[in-house]
Curated annotation (Swiss-Prot):
Domain RNase III: 8-130
Compartments, record wording: Cytoplasm
Family under the similarity heading: Belongs to the ribonuclease III family.
Entry's EC annotation: 3.1.26.3
Residues engaged in binding Mg(2+): 43, 116, 119
Cofactor: Mg(2+)
Domain DRBM: 157-226
The protein's name in its UniProt record: Ribonuclease 3
A GO cellular component entry from the record: cytoplasm
Length: 228
């Protein structure tokens, strides 16, 4: 299968990076099941660069946190599930180049293939630019997650922690609502509310609905901590 150039240009806008060497992006999207130059070497490179970018940011962000907590936070941020979430925010599955068998079995929806594609794009962007540029790009992708992760606690995302907190107290689950969507389709900003019975609702903003919900959930967790 081939991906139209117009779709790849839209993907560039979603990932917020424009390739000088367009063939690197095409290779990053090519699974080994497809004919041609596949993405496994780029994935290998991207995995190391991702670990470097997240490690250095966590090291600077948490100067008093020990190696164990830093490692746990990094593992949470760079795990396959998290990378697949980011890939879905980019609608990466629609752009993957798969062989007929993988395509038929729904490989474009598989977490592992999407996560590998994200790492391959990181590797491709590094070869296309430099380490500082690609580090800034990675930190932009992970911004809301880096802003909500904390040491010394279960490394679950804020929505999950909020849900488990309420369920443990047999309270109704939170309600999330879209308050506003601004911007063009490729550059939208969402404002979401999070409401719980008996507490003032809070708002979160982000470049995707999920990011805005996570930020709102984190604010609600802070409100619940203050209410204790």
């Amino acid at each position: 299968m081939m991906i139209k150039q117009a779709e790849l240009k839209r993907l560039e806008r979603r990932v917020d990076y424009t390739f000088s060497d367009f063939s690197l992006l095409q290779q990053a999207l090519t699974h080994r099941s497809a004919l041609g130059n596949h993405n496994e070497r780029l994935e290998f490179l991207g995995d190391s660069i991702l670990s470097y970018a997240i490690s250095t940011d966590l090291y600077a962000r948490f100067p008093k946190v020990d190696e164990g907590d830093l490692s746990r936070m990094r593992a949470t941020l760079v795990c396959g599930k998290m990378l697949a979430e980011i890939g879905r925010e980019f609608q990466l599955g629609d752009c993957l180049i798969l062989g007929p068998g993988e395509l038929k079995s729904g490989g474009f929806r598989r977490d592992s293939i999407i996560a590998d594609g994200v790492e391959a794009i990181i590797g491709a962007a590094f070869l296309d630019s430099d380490i500082d540029t690609v580090k800034k790009l990675i930190l932009k992708w992970f911004d809301s997650r880096l802003n909500t992760i904390e040491p010394g606690i279960s490394q679950k995302d804020p929505k999950t922690r909020l849900q488990e907190h309420l369920q443990s107290r047999k309270q109704p689950l939170p309600i999330y609502e879209v308050l506003e969507i601004k911007g063009e389709a490729h550059n939208q900003r969402f404002t979401m509310s999070c409401s719980i019975d008996g507490l003032k609702s809070v708002q979160g903003q982000g470049t995707s609905r999920r990011k805005a919900e996570q930020i709102a959930a984190n604010k609600m967790l802070d409100s619940l901590s203050g209410a204790k």
